[in-house]
Amino acid sequence: GCSHNLCVSITGIKDQFALEGEKLTQEYAALALGTAFHPYFVGSTFDPEAVGIEKQMLRKALEDEVNDKRLYCQRQANREFFGDSPAGVRQEGYLEEVDGLTPEALTEAYYEMLRTANIELIVLGCDEASTTAVKDALLTELSAIDRAPLPRAENIAMPRREPVRKVEHFDTTQAKLCMLFTLGR
């Protein structure tokens, strides 16, 4: 859709159950915030070797998607229906875009995300002091960034247009049909 989510999540035991009274919540927060705000760079960009590995995995996942005919049909229909609108942009991107991913481009996108993202903090199962400490740690990280969060995307309806029919042929015994409709005027 128009908004994509990146979730950094940590689950662990409460401080009160730590064997030696450790402040586990602080450690969880440090780990999550370190992951989000201090990724591993080689020089000033993401590690080229790691990017190469991730590109291979992404390529494989996108190529394998065609084996799940229902999902493939739905995603192809969304791509056709929404076109270039923000709702048509897939979180994973598209197979033809994988080769263009570079450590530099990904690093630039990462910094843009930090600058413009709407950020929500959810802390569950902690006392008020621990929750406040986590919030303060996040605010400290954010204070080092020149932020300009974008407004949240409004719900959109695609404009009415002539029906489009797209057919792809596969060597299968079962067909899939996906139909999308709009309330757009």
Predicted regions and their residues:
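Charge-rich, well-structured scaffold segments of protease-associated domains
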Residues: G1-L150
